[in-house]
């Protein structure tokens, strides 16, 4: 319950805006939770300063790949009754654009940020100037198995090491 209140409060604060709000929606837990929180705040906090023009979901689509979560994102937008914009991401990004994005991020990531950059570009083209997104929830809650292993250096004793090991094994 405490996490829920903190999460809703964090979203509510970020919805204070006098410009159009949107969100990058993948259909995963983090972005779905964010847009559902925005919907909840809009319905239940009418007297607050939260922006009422937030119903814009932008979805990066990767047809025919394991990365495509379009059907999950559509379920969320249908459930909430909000607009969605689907943007098919072309895997043949020009070299110049790829290099520009590398320059912007100043580092090489395990996966290029091309989809995110293209999605934000589309948001801007369609009039959304602020995007409230759910990035990094997987990392925050150890959604990736390898993140659990990062807890080993902080373990105090065998009991905590065993707990970390069990958390890792239970994810697999």
Predicted regions, residues:
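ATP-dependent adenylate-handling active sites, centered on carboxylate activation for C-N bond formation
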Residues: 1-172
């Amino acid at each position: 319950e405490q996490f829920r209140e903190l999460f809703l409060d964090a979203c509510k604060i970020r919805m204070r805006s006098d410009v159009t709000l949107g969100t990058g929606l993948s259909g995963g837990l983090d972005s779905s939770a964010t847009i559902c929180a925005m919907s909840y705040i809009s319905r239940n906090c009418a007297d607050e300063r939260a922006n009422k023009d937030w119903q814009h979901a932008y979805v990066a689509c990767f047809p025919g790949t394991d990365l495509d979560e379009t059907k999950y994102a559509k379920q969320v937008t249908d459930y909430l009754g909000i607009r969605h914009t689907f943007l098919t991401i072309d895997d043949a990004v020009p070299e110049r654009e790829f290099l520009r994005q590398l320059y912007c991020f100043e580092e090489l990531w395990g996966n290029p940020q091309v989809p995110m950059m293209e999605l934000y570009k589309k948001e801007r083209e369609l009039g959304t100037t602020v995007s409230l997104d759910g990035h990094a929830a997987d990392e925050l809650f150890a959604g990736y198995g390898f993140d659990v292993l990062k807890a080993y250096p902080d373990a105090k004793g065998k009991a905590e090491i065993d707990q970390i090991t069990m958390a890792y094994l239970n994810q697999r």
